[in-house]
């Protein structure tokens, strides 16, 4: 028996990551890139990998500022700068994530800083942007297109009809709803409490 061979098993995190990645084809990633640059930033998308374009956090901060301005009319909500220093880039990514959380993106659809900066989980980065587009579209339908299906709106529950008058007599037991017990009690049903029972 050989112990050198690696077991053919994967962790749950790895399985979930692969499942997420399978949902984003190159075409889907390109659509996300178009949404970020053309639809929101009104810029020409640079060539190359989308994650590399987003890695320094400047594009994400500009994206957040535009969405914030559309809501409040205030510009430059997040300060940013082009920098090659890792801690500056990661801080800018973190600021974008804080904005997205307040904007409405669910916690389970938000990536972590290292998912983008170290490319640990590209799919969740794409999922965050896709989710952000849905919330932006919900708030400003005419300005920001949506990636994928729109957010569903919760429909109010239909009104519950009140009970008929013959069921509203205030009794604790309704024979119309629960049946008639025919005066059942412990004595009539042979229920013995605290005494010996003979089971035949």
UniProtKB/Swiss-Prot annotation:
Residues 26-136 form the Calponin-homology (CH) domain. The modification Phosphoserine is found at residue 11. Keywords: Acetylation, Cytoplasm, Cytoskeleton, Phosphoprotein. GO terms for cellular component: actin cortical patch; actin cytoskeleton. Disulfide bonds: none annotated. Residues 144-168 are annotated as: Disordered. Residues 154-165 have a biased composition (Basic residues). Residues 151-164 are annotated as: Interaction with SH3 domain of ABP1. Its main location: cytoplasm. PANTHER family: CALPONIN, TRANSGELIN. Has actin-binding and actin-bundling activity. Stabilizes actin filaments against disassembly. Present with 1578 molecules/cell in log phase SD medium. This is Transgelin. It comes from Saccharomyces cerevisiae (strain ATCC 204508 / S288c).
């Amino acid at each position: 028996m050989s112990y050198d061979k690696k077991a053919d098993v994967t962790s749950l995190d790895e399985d979930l990551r692969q499942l997420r990645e399978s949902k984003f084809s190159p075409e889907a990633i390109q659509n996300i890139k178009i949404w970020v640059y053309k639809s929101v930033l009104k810029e020409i998308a640079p060539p190359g990998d989308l994650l590399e374009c987003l890695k320094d956090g400047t594009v994400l901060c500009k994206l957040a500022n535009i969405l914030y301005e559309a809501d409040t009319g205030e510009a430059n909500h997040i300060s940013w700068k082009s920098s090659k220093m890792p801690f500056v880039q990661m801080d800018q990514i973190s600021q974008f994530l804080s904005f997205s959380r307040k904007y409405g993106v669910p916690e389970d659809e938000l990536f972590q800083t290292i998912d983008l900066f170290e490319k640990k989980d590209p799919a969740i980065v794409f999922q965050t942007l896709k989710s952000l587009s849905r919330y932006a579209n919900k708030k400003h339908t005419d300005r920001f297109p949506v990636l994928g299906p729109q957010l569903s709106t919760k429909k109010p529950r239909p009104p519950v009809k009140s009970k008929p008058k013959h069921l509203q007599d205030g009794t604790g037991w309704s024979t119309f709803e629960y049946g008639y017990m025919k005066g059942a009690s412990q004595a009539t049903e042979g229920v013995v409490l605290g005494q010996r029972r003979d089971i035949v």
